[in-house]
Amino acid sequence: MNTPSQAQVRRAIAEAQTIVVKVGSSSLTEPSGHLDPQRLNALVAAIARVRLMGGRVVLVSSGAIAAGFGTLGFDKRPTDVADQQACAAVGQGLLMAQYEAAFARYGLRVGQILITVSDTIAPQQYRNVRRTLDRLLDLGAVPIINENDSLASNEIRFGDNDRLSALIANIVVADALVLLTDVDALYTAPPSEPGSKRISYVPNVEDALAKVQVGGTGSNVGTGGMVTKMEAARVAAVSGIPAVLTCASNAGPAMMGDPVGTAFAPINDRGSSRRLWIGFASHPQGTLVADSGAAKAVRGGAASLLAAGVVEVKGDFAAGDAVWVDDEQGNHLAKGLVGFDSEEIPQMLGRNTAQLKRFLGEEYAHPLVHRDNLVLV
């Protein structure tokens, strides 16, 4: 696709019918770590304005742990996983009570959805999330989504909801993603460093990720840094969704398409949510190693992975699981949904379709990974 201008991207955001807004913990809390009602109410006012103008808004909100740790007697955000989960269990209710009261002042209802990584990995849960969100939006509610911090572990997380927000944007077929943080824009280096310059527009976020120096950790009340926000913008851009990154106080202007923060252009036409799920949400359970010919065909982007071109199977997986497709040097080429169990595949390796049909039966005369279920990485 042709790269749009900054004006075109801002206009697309202003005209968006469905917007996903992500807000981090540090944008909702006081320095002490407690929820800041003024910040939360200001965000709600900005969202309510869009909603009352006929737009549809999904809010992905962090803040459960930040809302709960003070109530449970902690001076700061705990680092122990069990303590964090306890704080989230208490804080999520406090957070939603604040949101419910704030939106009610505008005559708007909210619906809470708590999600873990597994809810976007398993196809059935993924479809359930999509159906629930679509229905809430159709009924005029504002869905409020958070990672289920009381169940999630540090080993498998979205990253302060940043990646989650980009996946949700694709699930609801959003027209724009707004990432709210505690800095007003993306900079060429940490804003406190001399010579750091604000970046108002990123035509290709993948190029920017390689060039822009970003901090790797978040604030003392959040878990995400600028890296996860850039990754979220990349997921959105790859799936054809424009994005803007700015501070929470700029939420209203950002959704109106005003020149605040940093705008990110989409770098692909909108893809299917299924392919985005394969590429970004699914967690590979094993690896298929392709020979040089099969690797070349996979890189071409239009070929299925056939048993004749696979030389090794790694891992334990079932049909329908996500797997890596690697070359013989160990480089990841693609992710895909495999059509056979790992125990079935060894007997298939090196055989062409006719041989598979003859020696193993008709049910084996199919690609290991069909091209429709294969996403290059």
UniProtKB/Swiss-Prot annotation:
Substrate binds at residues 62, 149, 161. SMART domains: PUA. Pfam families: AA_kinase, PUA. ATP binds at residues 22, 181-182, 223-229. It is an enzyme of class 2 (transferase). The keyword Signal does not apply. NCBIfam families: proB (TIGR01027). This is Glutamate 5-kinase. It comes from Bifidobacterium adolescentis (strain ATCC 15703 / DSM 20083 / NCTC 11814 / E194a).
